[in-house]
Amino acid sequence: CVIAVPSAAAMGKRPEKNILSFHLQGHQSDGPKMVFPLPMGNKKRFFRKSPVTFNKEIVSLKHFITEDGTYGATFSFNKAAAGRIAAITTSNQDKWLVAMLNGRPVDAVYIDKPVGDGRLVIWRGIKQVEISRFEYAMPLTGETSKQWKERIKGHERQRKAAQKEAQEAQNERNRRRNN
C-alpha cells in the first residue's frame, strides 16, 4: 500500500531532523538527575536519561503502517551500537526499553531476550511527517547508498521546483497589486 503525501521537501523546505533515542529502565532510587518518570498503564516506571543509542548510529529503517493509523519502524544500527544493544539486552532482561522521538515517548518494549541483530523496533506512534524526515536522513533497509542518494536528489528537485513556483506566484501577486 503506497500513500501519496507531499513531503516537506516537496513543499519547498528541507525536513527537520528527528531525534530518536532508546532509554533503558532504571530505578527511582537513581535520583532525578539520572532517571525520568513515565506512566505506563497504571504504573509509573523510571528510565535512564542516558540513552542506549544515538541518531548517528542508525544505518537504515523499514517503516510500516499500524492499526491505529500511525507508523512503526525497524531501525538497523551500526556494528558498535549493535554490540552495545546486544550486551544491554542480555544483561537487562525483564526490563523495559522506551523509544523517545523528538522529546516524546513513542513506544516501549519489554526485553524478554537478547537482541543480537542490531535492530530495534518501534511498534506504533510515529507520525507521517517523522517518517518523511527519516526517509530524507537515511536509506531504507535494502536500499543501496546510490539509490538513497538518487531518491534524495529527486526530493531536492521537487523542493527547488516548489520554491521557484512559490516565487513566481509571489511575483505575480506583487505585479497585480502594483497595477
Placement of each model-derived feature along the sequence:
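Structural signature of multi-pass, alpha-helical inner-membrane proteins
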Residues: 7-179
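Bacterial N-terminal signal peptides
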Residues: 1-4
